């Protein structure tokens, strides 16, 4: 029987963590991505790491990125990766007051809708990463920006809008909103093109994921 998690009451109450591994090594020494998704708002952080980092270093990154920006979550949902089941990680979360919820290999549905969100993110990240190879980690901030400012059907708006009550205002999106702006600097033009590319990858990934989901659903209907 599917085990569903309770719906969070506040934006930063509950997060889901997972690793996207097996990526090409970058010049900065990264070969994996730590994906952290806020379950209520669907907003996400994509953090480049090396999978050989010790748990203590991963904990430092967690504190400097997540806790610094959003405070301590009440609940952390993850799979049973050894890093999430380690004594150090458990004691740290116990000290911070966060409850750990580990999904079972036999009941991955514990993650519910978030499991599908993570899968879509993995498809998007891998599509962008494989194209950029040795420099994919330099694209992660733009991938994160694009994801958090793209429409999500499950919440009916962009994650950024859920978090802050308004759509993100940025020169990168002015060309879509009809505002007149001169994109002068080469950096802005280049960044705009990168965002367009990432959005195309995201749409393609979502389309493939939907087709796969629809096919599985149709196969079950008989």
Give short role names for the model-derived ranges.
Residues 1-222:
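Integrase module of LTR retroelements
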